[in-house]
Amino acid sequence: MKIIILLGLIGATSSAPLITQRLLSASNSHELLLNLNNGQLLPLQFQSAFNSWIPPFPGLLQQQQQQAQVSGHPQFPLSTLESFAGLFPNQIPFSRQVGFAQGGQAGQPDFSQQQTPSQTQQASPMSYVVPVKVPQDQTQMFQYYPVYMLLPWEQPQQTVTSSPQQTGQQLYEEQIPFYNQFGFVPQQAEPGVPGGQQHLVLDSFVGTAPETPGMPAVEGPLYPQKEPIGFKQDNVGVSTPSTSPKPDTGNFFTSEINPTIAPLLPEQKVNADSLREP
């Protein structure tokens, strides 16, 4: 119905007698209005290739004006009109209607006029292909889906980066106290020995160096040694509470230079090596 209404509006606008010369149109209403004064009905002519949808060519208009002024009945050869009709593939179904319309005579204009609108209605949906853009839009939409499907790839990175952080923190807790106090990393206690890690934590508070770091925990003193050694030389005159059962605070109030540090450090190394050989 919309197509029929549009065709009616276009035919009404194009049939207005604004120009005195005869012009080709998609319907026969324009020619009928121009020839009402003469009282004659002309046979249908080739009017499909040059309708209101297609802009007219300037060269054809000049030829049409000359022929209209000379004879009043313009006639185009079929060969030239078919060549021009081939340039417009959307108007091919209209060119087939012309062969039937040319068979009409001057005495039968109403019969041909009733058939041409029905044929134009059947051919109009064939000439215009509207749903061509639908598959293109669907293909474009499918191209965007992989972008959103790749979003969860951030999760495996979090699991990968979190695993070395745990190992780094464990190594940091085990090795840092020995770097600050002794300046070197001694061999740590085996993980299977019970109480080995507890001795390492207590040494950081007391400040004493054990002779055998792999010794298991027994009742009594934790590390039987001759003399405790204090390594905190910077904090002179400051006493800190210790967690050992028998605290010894004799070496905390010493002078800035402790002469017992230098000779005792190599002795600890010799005693540790002699105990590990057998």
Curated annotation (Swiss-Prot):
Biased composition (Low complexity): 107-124
Gene Ontology cellular component annotations, sorted alphabetically: cell periphery; cytoplasm; extracellular region; extracellular space; nucleus; supramolecular fiber
Glycosylation sites: 116, 120, 240, 243, 249, 254
Region feature (Disordered): 103-124, 230-278
UniProt keyword terms in alphabetical order: Biomineralization, Cytoplasm, Glycoprotein, Nucleus, Secreted, Signal
Broad class of the protein's primary localization: secreted
Post-translational modification: O-glycosylated.
Record-linked InterPro entries: Odam
Region (Interaction with ARHGEF5): 126-128
Compartment(s) where it occurs, according to its Swiss-Prot or TrEMBL record: Secreted; Cytoplasm; Nucleus
Signal peptide location: 1-15
UniProt biased composition (Polar residues): 236-258
One Pfam family hit: ODAM
GO biological process: one example: response to wounding
Function: Tooth-associated epithelia protein that probably plays a role in odontogenesis, the complex process that results in the initiation and generation of the tooth. May be incorporated in the enamel matrix at the end of mineralization process. Involved in the induction of RHOA activity via interaction with ARHGEF and expression of downstream factors such as ROCK. Plays a role in attachment of the junctional epithelium to the tooth surface.
Subunit relationships: Interacts (via C-terminus) with ARHGEF5.
Stated family: Belongs to the ODAM family.
PANTHER family: ODONTOGENIC AMELOBLAST-ASSOCIATED PROTEIN (PTHR16237:SF3)
Record protein name field: Odontogenic ameloblast-associated protein
Source taxonomy: Eukaryota, Metazoa, Chordata, Craniata, Vertebrata
